[in-house]
């Protein structure tokens, strides 16, 4: 918690976040940003920031969920591959997947994805979404520009110029909301699955 809401309340587990110990709250939340930081050292070292006690089996399981195992298995040194400063020797999509794996190792109760699959292809993103769907006890907040990233969510919130515009499921919004319809038709009908058609 970096700052408090100016209106209303933010609740976790039905309880105002201001009632939680800050460190306990931060331990319960995992966040993956669009641009994450990887440290100099091995991939293993980087992943263990999520869980210092993780075994190799744990690391590989998280990498499978994040679809990082596919490119890791092609690296001669696997988990012991040295990363350049800031992860300069892996692609943007590979970096995002490693950061997702690292966050999954934390076993958070609340998982926040802030455009964190923007650099991966839609097939890989679909696999990651499928893996996340198996985390039934985890609350997932996904901030995204791709319709495909959020269309299976229990609830979708549309912000327009920083204000709450509409709330509903994919089917509800597609039936009644013009902004959602515009984004959908721009991305899906126009073949723009990467979300570049409409930005709000």
Name the predicted role of every residue range.
Residues 23, 29-34, 141:
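ABC nucleotide-binding domain signature
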Residues 5, 11-16, 69-98, 116, ...:
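ABC-fold ATPase nucleotide-binding domain signature/coupling loops
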Residues 121-131:
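Conserved D-loop/post-Walker B switch-helix segment of ABC ATPase nucleotide-binding domains
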Residues 105-109:
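A short, proline-enriched helix->beta-strand linker immediately N-terminal to the Walker B motif
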Residues 111-114:
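Catalytic Walker B motif of ABC-type/P-loop ATPase nucleotide-binding domains
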Residues 74-76, 130, 151-200:
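C-terminal portion of ABC ATPase nucleotide-binding domains
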Residues 133-144, 150:
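Conserved catalytic loops of ABC-family nucleotide-binding domains
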Residues 9-11, 19, 26, 44-85, ...:
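ABC ATPase nucleotide-binding domain helical subdomain, centered on the C-loop/LSGGQ "ABC signature"
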């Amino acid at each position: 918690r970096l700052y408090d809401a100016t209106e209303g309340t933010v609740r976790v587990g039905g309880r105002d976040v201001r009632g939680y110990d800050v460190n306990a709250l931060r331990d319960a939340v995992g966040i993956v940003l669009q641009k994450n930081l990887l440290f100099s050292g091995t991939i293993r070292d980087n992943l263990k920031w999520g869980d210092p006690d993780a075994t190799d089996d744990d690391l590989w399981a998280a990498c499978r969920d994040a679809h990082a195992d596919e490119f890791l298995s092609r690296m001669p040194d696997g988990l012991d591959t040295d990363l350049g400063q800031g992860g300069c020797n892996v692609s943007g999509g590979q970096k995002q997947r490693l950061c997702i794996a690292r966050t999954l190792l934390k076993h958070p109760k609340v998982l926040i994805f802030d455009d964190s699959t923007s650099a991966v292809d839609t097939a890989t993103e679909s696999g990651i979404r499928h893996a996340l769907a198996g985390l039934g006890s985890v609350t997932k907040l996904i901030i995204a520009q791709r319709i495909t990233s959020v269309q299976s969510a229990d609830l979708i919130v549309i912000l327009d110029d920083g204000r709450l515009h509409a709330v509903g499921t994919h089917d509800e919004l597609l039936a009644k909301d013009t902004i959602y319809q515009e984004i959908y038709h721009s991305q899906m009908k126009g073949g723009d699955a990467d979300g570049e058609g409409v930005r709000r």
